[in-house]
């Protein structure tokens, strides 16, 4: 069977090729009756519609927006935060007849979550993407994929605060959120806190101690900095591995099993006059996502440890499961964040271009007065 074209469809309907083009690209130029007849005939004859790439060249727009995800697509579909964000974004974008192209990043092979290899196939996808604008979820604006998009003239919208006055972003005050959590725990007497973070560092399997410069997410680094400032005590950063309940539980189990982690180099021959400096076991665990925090609660319960009597637990994001688990957490309007990003993607003139969303501490049943040391066992 011959391939259907604009000309063959036009001949079948009895109109010009220009009228067929208007039916798809400028429907306001036709009567509803004529457009319906054209679309019905196209469906009957198997005409797929105008070529998207060709239409982009002619009209200067692709009628599609992209979302650059910091993880594989299979993970994004299981992440409550990503699902809620994409729901909000799609509600706005699809209402205007615009398509969404999801562009997940593979796990980096060089050990850096935010710096995939320059020849990565992910970057090729961005080079070839037929999109008008790109949302960048939890990645820096100087990420190679973002730089490629910018060089192509594609508008960018990020979900992290940028110092660039010309940039478009929708974010929360992550540093302020960390301060909120830190002040809440400090009021309860907590001075020794463990923080579970998602990471893909080479040593980033659940249960590895990290430094702040190893944090891949900008929002995570800001939250830890705010927490550390407010606590004024010992803040230990622990890799939670991938963002999952299982990883949070594994990291917490490692924390409970460790033999009082040294905080300074161990002398080659310890003596009574040169003891090994140690860190007290934390009285609180903060998951920088609710998912990791829920894993911590699960691990503590499996050891017969009471939350919050023996260990307090706090999360971030306030996903639906957090309320069900009575988890103390930072609430951020995830769905609203996606909606704001969608509006900025659609309209380059939309104001304001920089949206700081409100946050609040939701105090529930997993935080309480700090227990008296000694360390857990």
Predicted regions, residues:
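Short beta-strand scaffold positions
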Residues: 10, 136, 287-288
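N-terminal helix-turn-helix DNA-binding module of bacterial transcription factors
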Residues: 1-64, 371, 377
